[in-house]
Design a protein with these regions (language model features):
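Phosphate-binding/catalytic loop of phosphoryl-transfer enzymes
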Residues: 4-87
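Generic structural signal for well-ordered alpha-helical scaffold segments
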Residues: 34-39, 150-161, 215
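A glycine-rich, Thr/Ser-enriched phosphate-binding loop motif common to dinucleotide/cofactor-binding enzymes
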Residues: 22-32, 144-155, 206
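Phosphate/pyrophosphate-binding loops at sites that engage ATP/ADP/AMP, CoA/4′-phosphopantetheine
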Residues: 138, 157-167
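Glycine-rich phosphate-binding loops at beta-strand->alpha-helix junctions
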Residues: 165-187
């Protein structure tokens, strides 16, 4: 309502409530936008978004879409950089690159039952906070960062995909972290590239996504599917003001 008052234009908001009320998890909401952008590209294609939480959109050769949150993304690394470096994030993955992964603690993190659940599934940014605090306690900051970066990558690599992708495209702030990108390249035996490689604007992608969802909302088209949020049926959503 405030945005409508300030801008004097119709505003679509509250994209998630209808999905949640119909039994869905309300996230992730980008998969249909990813599918629209990827029309004409060879499939299967995996689009990975690494924000505070990491999530993936799998676009099948048969036109199917599967999505889920894969695990923590940049969030724990950002928290670590703020705590030990006084910086909002680990620029260029420098802290993680200078450390060594603690394999035993990494395996403890990956023992969380979330990773055994099928897709679709979703997380909150703080879902792993307690476990991460335990797993990084007593580690040197660089080793903690290296371990958390490996945790992010392993969560993505263990995503329940129906088939191996031909290509992995990465969006979100994590695409600018060389440690995460190198980890993904090692985990997938296919090209792993930032979305700019196919002409997408990685910095604007999320804003573009919700503009696209707003138009779908105005047209009464679905914003989520049973295979993206777990909702019982394809679900539209959004609330128009103005």
């Amino acid at each position: 309502a405030l945005l409508h008052q300030l801008c004097k234009i119709p505003v679509v908001s509250d994209f998630r409530s209808a999905d949640v009320q119909a039994g869905g998890q309300g996230a992730p909401l980008a998969p249909l936008f990813h599918a629209a952008l990827a029309q004409g590209m060879p499939k299967p294609l995996l689009v990975v978004n690494i924000g505070g939480v990491a999530n993936m959109t799998f676009l099948g050769a048969d036109g199917g879409i599967l999505a889920c949150d894969t695990g923590p993304g940049n969030g724990p690394l950002d928290d670590l950089a703020q705590k030990f470096l006084g910086l909002p994030y680990d620029k260029d993955g420098a802290l993680a690159a200078s450390g060594t992964v603690d394999e035993a603690r990494l395996e403890a993190l990956l023992g969380h039952p979330y990773f055994a659940r099928p897709a679709p599934k979703s997380l909150d940014r703080l879902s792993f906070s307690g476990l991460i605090a335990q797993a990084t306690e007593g580690l040197a900051p660089a080793d903690a960062a290296a371990t958390l970066a490996a945790f992010c990558v392993a969560g993505i690599a263990r995503a329940p995909l129906p088939a191996p992708p031909l290509r992995v495209l990465v969006c979100g702030g994590g695409r600018k972290n060389p440690v995460l990108m190198a980890g993904l390249a090692a985990a997938f035996d296919v090209p792993v590239e930032p979305v700019e490689a196919v002409g997408w604007d990685g910095d604007a992608l999320e804003a573009q996504c919700f503009g696209y969802l707003a138009v779908r909302s105005l047209r009464g088209l679905p914003l989520s599917l049973p295979t993206t949020t777990g909702v019982a049926r394809a679900m539209t959503g959004g609330v128009l003001t103005g």
